Regions:
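C-terminal luminal/periplasmic domains and tails of membrane-associated envelope-modifying transferases
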Residues: 98-319
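Transmembrane alpha-helix segments characteristic
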Residues: 11-32, 196-205
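Hydrophobic/aromatic-rich transmembrane helices and adjacent perimembrane loops
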Residues: 1, 29-30, 37-61, 217
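Transmembrane alpha-helical segments
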Residues: 33, 57, 71-113
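Short beta-strand segments
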Residues: 1-4, 23, 75, 79, ...
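Hydrophobic, aromatic-rich transmembrane alpha-helices
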Residues: 1-13
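Lipid-exposed faces of alpha-helical membrane segments in multi-pass integral membrane proteins
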Residues: 2-3, 22-30, 46-49, 71-81
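Membrane-interfacial entry segments at the cytosolic side of transmembrane helices
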Residues: 12-17, 61-76
Length: 319
């Protein structure tokens, strides 16, 4: 409605419109180009200008005809009802034209949809159903502790747990229920396709959705890449402790589980190199390089230079 009012020049206040629109455009351009594009919270200031502009347009319409008061009133009531139905998980709020809060994670992630705020509701859900054996892929794992909320689930590895070096053992197959935070289900952390150890769940219909942010899946699931990632972490920790033979066993097991994983090939190559086997390490590095060239360009930028540097170091050492 506001755009229509401005386009038809019913709101004939050029200076006031510029005063409200220019800051919005400038702020959005800066916010979207500085490399800190991680959440709508960084652009909340633009809403102040937009709401004033919307209020001005509504005032013009109502002044022209009282019928517009009913239209504006209905739109406000719809917005209030939409917001109330999202309670208590306002972080994931999206209106129904967008698809509602349970669809937000498909388009936005992190603080736009899920910051791990559903633990109390997850605890109640499991308690009401008497669930004692489950798995939880929790966005804030390693930072917040689900067990404090009475959640008995075993954890699944996330980027955060790997970064914090939280040891997690994952078998090749697991029995549900499996609970997955929206930010993890989106796949934004590990990457798309073959990089995502939990990609299969995107194709499945959840049994339930808790607070628009935790998806519940029942059944038995094969988890080779997640299991391999947990073994890679264990292998690297053992290598740091100079337990190279055990580290080698874990790395080989990781490759056996997920031979088409860049992570597993690099881990095995690194450990072989540390054990004084550069030729064998080269084989794994070259396989990792081959795999890296098949992923999306955005993720190639992260992987290729690192792998190429390893291979270059090998060539330098051999001269």
């Amino acid at each position: 409605l506001t755009i229509g009012v401005i386009a038809t020049r019913r709101l004939n206040r050029r200076r006031e419109i510029l005063f409200l629109v220019v800051p919005v455009i400038f702020y959005l351009v800066v916010a979207l180009t500085v490399g800190m594009n991680i959440g709508v919270r960084h652009i909340l200031v633009v809403y102040v200008f937009l709401y004033v502009l919307i209020g001005g347009a509504a005032s013009i319409l109502i002044g022209k005809s009282r019928k517009w008061a009913y239209v504006v009133g209905v739109l406000l009531l719809v917005h209030v009802a939409s917001s109330a139905l999202t309670f208590p998980n306002y972080i994931a709020y999206a209106n129904e034209l967008w698809g509602g809060p349970s669809q937000t994670y498909k388009y936005l992630t992190d603080s736009n949809a899920d910051w791990g705020q559903q633990l109390k509701s997850v605890g109640r859900y499991l308690d009401q159903r008497g669930v004692k054996d489950c798995w939880f892929l929790y966005f804030a794992e390693g930072v917040a502790e689900p067990s404090y909320y009475g959640i008995p689930c075993k954890p699944l590895p996330t980027i955060s747990t790997l970064w914090l070096n939280v040891p997690i053992d994952v078998p090749n197959s697991i029995d549900g229920p499996v609970l997955i935070s929206a930010s993890n289900l989106s796949g934004v952390e590990f990457g798309p396709g073959s990089l995502d150890p939990y990609g299969q769940f995107k194709l499945l219909k959840p049994t339930a959705v808790i607070d628009h942010g935790v998806f519940v899946f029942d059944g038995k699931f094969e988890m080779p890449l997640a299991a391999a990632i947990s073994k890679v972490q264990k292998a690297r920790n053992l290598a740091q402790e100079k337990q190279l033979e055990r580290a080698l066993q874990e790395a080989k097991a990781a490759v056996a589980l997920a031979p088409d994983s860049i992570q597993t090939q690099l881990a095995l190559g690194d450990i072989l190199l540390e054990m004084g086997q550069p030729q064998q390490a080269r084989t794994n590095y070259e396989k990792a390089l081959e795999l890296a060239k098949t992923i999306e360009p955005e993720f190639q930028i992260r992987s290729l230079p690192d792998i190429e540097q390893r291979l270059q170091s090998l060539e330098t050492a051999e001269r």
